[in-house]
Swiss-Prot record:
One of several proteins that assist in the late maturation steps of the functional core of the 30S ribosomal subunit. Associates with free 30S ribosomal subunits (but not with 30S subunits that are part of 70S ribosomes or polysomes). Required for efficient processing of 16S rRNA. May interact with the 5'-terminal helix region of 16S rRNA. It comes from Helicobacter pylori (strain Shi470). GO terms for cellular component: cytoplasm. It is found in: Cytoplasm. Its main location: cytoplasm. HAMAP family: RbfA. This is Ribosome-binding factor A. InterPro entries: KH_dom-like_a/b, RbfA, RbfA_dom_sf, Ribosome-bd_factorA_CS. Monomer. Binds 30S ribosomal subunits, but not 50S ribosomal subunits or 70S ribosomes. The keyword Oxidoreductase does not apply. One of its GO terms (biological process) is maturation of SSU-rRNA. Gene3D superfamilies: 3.30.300.20.
Amino acid sequence: MNAHKERLESNLLELLQEALASLNDSELNSLSVTRVECSKGKHHAFVFVLSQDHKILSKLKKAEGLIRQFVLQASGWFKCPKLSFVLDNSLEKQLRLDAIFNEIAKGKDND
């Protein structure tokens, strides 16, 4: 990945956290953005949020305009990528893998 894209994604992640914190919705205020992945042309960004509630995605979709407006004002950028919000299940996957490794380790201890 090139340095420019990494910097853009990092800046966008910080701005999105600030944008969510500035909204008047307590559910959206408490969300954590775990990572941002921009497309090659940087016209589109996938925003991964940490939540178990699928309903939060519809709230984020409704607030996308306000979030993009905040990002534009705070960054001074000419354009803001279109945002697609995705539930981040990487933590859940990591917990499952840890449980599997623990079972394997217990099996070796019993041998």
